[in-house]
Regions:
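N-terminal Rossmann-like or analogous alpha/beta NTP/dinucleotide-binding catalytic cores
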Residues: 2-130
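Active-site cores that bind ATP or allylic diphosphates and position pyrophosphate for catalysis
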Residues: 108-206
Length: 206
């Protein structure tokens, strides 16, 4: 059985990242063949500054290790180091209906909050589908807010398989810890770096 998931390095790691994702990664590394990555291409949709993105990417790698992910048990990698992610995303985009992306909660939520949309944000689910499908995982540990993106991944995989009349892609299942499915931020909304309501993971006692 294989597990795959990732985290954006769009800012300092916060407790929502830990309870919503990384804690699951650590628990699953003794049960599954694990692939966990730093989603630095996804981070470009909200944090395109090169130097800060590079710095944050390194920090998230160190945080993964500090919080218990063991490179002897799981494969850890950076999204941009594997060019096949974007190559597959382009291929998948040609079988992905526009309406499927227009219904994505993440896109609608961010635009409703006044975050200026771009094409990267709109096609985010297609790249996420490529991230997932190229590794044939059985489960995808995600926060509850990402559940729809895994469902979109399944829809894209089904469309691709039907288009080419072959079972090319496995249909992954999301894996969510319901007790911490969505960690609230300081304003009561979902904790998110793009909303500015996070509590950093490694804050001092002060």
């Amino acid at each position: 059985m294989r597990s795959l998931s990732g985290i954006q390095p769009s800012g300092i790691l916060h407790i929502g990242n830990y309870f919503g994702a990384i804690r699951q990664f650590v628990e699953f590394q003794n049960q599954y063949e694990g692939f966990y990555f730093i989603a630095n291409y996804h981070a470009l949709t909200s944090s395109p500054e090169g130097e800060s993105l590079k710095r944050n990417t390194i920090e998230v790698v160190l945080d993964y290790l500090a919080l218990g992910l063991d490179p002897e048990k799981s494969t850890l990698f950076i999204q941009s180091d594997v060019p096949e992610h974007t190559e597959l995303a382009w291929i998948l985009s040609n079988v992905t209906p526009m309406g499927l992306l227009e219904r994505a909660h993440s896109y609608k939520d961010k635009t409703a909050k006044g975050i200026k949309p771009n094409l990267g944000l709109f096609t985010y689910p297609v790249l996420m589908a490529a991230d997932i499908l190229m590794y044939d995982p059985d489960i995808v540990p995600v926060g509850k807010d990402q559940k729809q993106h895994v469902e979109i991944t399944r829809d894209i995989a089904i469309k691709f398989n039907e288009t080419f009349d072959r079972e090319v892609f496995k249909l992954p299942q999301d894996k969510i810890f319901e007790t911490v499915a969505v960690v609230p931020g300081t304003d009561g909304d979902k904790m998110s770096k793009s909303y500015g309501n996070v509590i950093n993971m490694f804050l001092s006692r002060k």
